[in-house]
């Protein structure tokens, strides 16, 4: 039997001691005191940061929001049904972030940027913080490029520019989402990346929007971020920031992006739920004191980048639902004060058949004609003036029995102008088609037609101009101006089409 000598034993021990490395790993842990309603209270976690991600024993992730003297209030990113009192929690040392890449285009994801469309994982090599600071003053430039929505009423009278924040506000079922989705459809071929964020919506509504995008070929440049009504409040609260992080990724790569939040009032409700459960003091309408900051830090991330940063842009279109037209409620007034203008949708107009139901009188864009091409400025000024005069006259005419000829003519013109603003859903018009439509109306070419004939006449006129006078569209596209040559072509087309139309109607 082999025996070990004493010196061999000492050599082995010495080698082992030399190989030993001291590695101290300090893990910041805590214990669950209480859990329920999407909130957990944790004892310990002494060095946790505000907003840091924490991981529970069974894998659920949470965010530390309340740092109190004897416990930490954590909001859960899942249902947390498996979390038990006394189970351990560890701090991760990370703030919430998501992977980002071009591969997200055409996909439907949740607030954690995980795919929910059943088409497999999304490859990504980079990541971005969900909440990153908004661009500073020096990093921005003023808005000057138009972002066409394809809707005549908006592009002519309430123009939106790239980098602007324009609120879409109105009662339920007035076509708010339709205005936003039409804007996305109109970005086809414009090299604009679109992000649609659905917060607390019905799953069927989101599915309908996604189907529309797929049918119209808009998904190839669109990302849909969805947290439906059955999602935990934490995820509904995070969804808009996830969408903004994805849009920022493209903006800082010198691309133009557009983001729709549908709708921030649902996010505010989710945040109110979280805050009340965390026992934060309630304020007006039981919202917490920092609900303004909730939306301002989100919407301030939309910007037009300076030339040093590559002139990318992020245009934000938040949608807010009002109750019985009350825009003086807390969330609507907050968002109105943060944004650069608002588009009011009226239930009365919607029910009377004027769709999109935009109330032009009280809608406003604070960027104004800086976000219009010259050709649109040339025709839109007259339209806005005539519609304003018509609205005034119409109210007066209800009480007057006998009107003079000039007033009757002005009322007839106004009715036809209002008719030309009507558009079907998912049928956006190009700038050239909009200019032609407005020019026809404001110059009295529709006055001889019956109101019921206006829509049919305009559809045929657009087709006729496209087929027989393609130079018109070329001039508008290249010069962005309604030149004399373009005006001559337009007048010829209107005259020829009017003659054809009258003959058709007679036969």
UniProtKB/Swiss-Prot annotation:
It is a peripheral membrane protein. The keyword Zinc-finger does not apply. ATP binds at residues 170-177. The keyword Translocase applies. It is an enzyme of class 7 (translocase). It comes from the Eukaryota. InterPro entries: ATP_synth_asu-like_sf, ATP_synth_asu_C, ATP_synth_asu_C_sf, ATP_synth_F1_a_nt-bd_dom, ATP_synth_F1_asu, ATPase_a/bsu_AS, ATPase_F1/V1/A1_a/bsu_N, ATPase_F1/V1/A1_a/bsu_N_sf. GO terms for molecular function: ADP binding; ATP binding; proton-transporting ATP synthase activity, rotational mechanism. Its EC number is 7.1.2.2. Disulfide bonds: none annotated. Pfam families: ATP-synt_ab (PF00006), ATP-synt_ab_C (PF00306), ATP-synt_ab_N (PF02874). It catalyses: ATP + H2O + 4 H(+)(in) = ADP + phosphate + 5 H(+)(out). Keywords: ATP synthesis, ATP-binding, CF(1), Chloroplast, Hydrogen ion transport, Ion transport, Membrane, Nucleotide-binding, Plastid, Thylakoid, Translocase, Transport. It is found in: Plastid, Chloroplast thylakoid membrane. The record marks 363 as: Required for activity. GO terms for cellular component: chloroplast thylakoid membrane; proton-transporting ATP synthase complex. F-type ATPases have 2 components, CF(1) - the catalytic core - and CF(0) - the membrane proton channel. CF(1) has five subunits: alpha(3), beta(3), gamma(1), delta(1), epsilon(1). CF(0) has four main subunits: a, b, b' and c. PANTHER family: ATP SYNTHASE SUBUNIT ALPHA, MITOCHONDRIAL. Belongs to the ATPase alpha/beta chains family. Produces ATP from ADP in the presence of a proton gradient across the membrane. The alpha chain is a regulatory subunit. This is ATP synthase subunit alpha, chloroplastic. It comes from Nandina domestica (Heavenly bamboo).
């Amino acid at each position: 039997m082999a025996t070990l000598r004493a010196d061999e034993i000492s050599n082995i021990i010495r080698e082992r001691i030399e190989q030993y490395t001291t590695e101290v790993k300090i893990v910041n842990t805590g214990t669950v005191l209480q859990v329920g309603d999407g909130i957990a209270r944790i004892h310990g976690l002494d060095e946790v940061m505000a907003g840091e991600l924490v991981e529970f024993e069974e894998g659920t992730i949470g965010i530390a929001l309340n740092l109190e003297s004897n416990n930490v209030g954590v909001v859960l990113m899942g249902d947390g049904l498996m979390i038990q009192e006394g189970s351990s929690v560890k701090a991760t040392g990370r703030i919430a972030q998501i992977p980002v890449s071009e591969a997200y285009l055409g996909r439907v994801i949740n607030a954690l940027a995980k795919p929910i469309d059943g088409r497999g994982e999304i490859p990504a090599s980079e990541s971005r913080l969900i909440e990153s600071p908004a661009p500073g003053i020096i990093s921005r430039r003023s808005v000057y490029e138009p972002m066409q929505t394809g809707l005549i009423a908006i592009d002519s009278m309430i123009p939106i520019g790239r980098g602007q924040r324009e609120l879409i506000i109105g009662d339920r079922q007035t076509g708010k989402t339709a205005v936003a989705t039409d804007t996305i459809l109109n970005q086809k071929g414009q090299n604009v990346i679109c992000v649609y964020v659905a917060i607390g919506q019905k799953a069927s509504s989101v599915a309908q929007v996604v189907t529309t995008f797929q049918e119209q070929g808009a998904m190839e440049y669109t990302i849909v971020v969805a947290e439906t009504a059955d999602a935990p409040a934490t995820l509904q609260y995070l969804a808009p920031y996830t969408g903004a992080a994805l849009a920022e990724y493209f903006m800082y790569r010198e691309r133009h992006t557009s983001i729709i939040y549908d709708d921030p009032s649902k996010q505010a409700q989710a945040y109110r739920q979280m805050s009340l459960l965390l026992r934060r003091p309630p304020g007006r309408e039981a919202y917490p004191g920092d609900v303004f900051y909730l939306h301002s830090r989100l919407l301030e991330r939309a910007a037009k980048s300076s030339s040093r940063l590559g002139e990318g842009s992020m245009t934000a279109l938040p949608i807010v639902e009002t109750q019985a037209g009350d825009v003086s409620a807390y969330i609507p007034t907050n968002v109105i004060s943060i944004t650069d203008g608002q588009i009011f949708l009226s239930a009365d107009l919607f029910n009377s058949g004027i769709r999109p139901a935009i109330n032009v009188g009280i809608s406003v864009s604070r960027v104004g004609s800086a976000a219009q091409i010259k050709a649109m400025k040339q025709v839109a000024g007259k339209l806005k003036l005539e519609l304003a005069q018509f609205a005034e006259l119409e109210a007066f005419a209800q009480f007057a029995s006998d009107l003079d000829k000039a007033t009757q003519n002005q009322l007839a013109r106004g009715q036809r102008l209002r008719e030309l603003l009507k558009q079907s859903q998912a049928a956006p018009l190009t700038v050239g088609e909009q200019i032609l439509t407005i020019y026809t109306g404001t110059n009295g070419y529709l006055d001889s037609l019956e109101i019921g004939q206006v829509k049919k006449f305009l559809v045929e006129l657009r087709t006729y101009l496209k087929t027989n006078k393609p130079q018109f569209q070329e001039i508008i596209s290249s010069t962005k101006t309604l030149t004399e040559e373009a005006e001559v072509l337009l007048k010829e087309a209107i005259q020829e089409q009017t003659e054809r139309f009258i003959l058709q109607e007679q036969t």
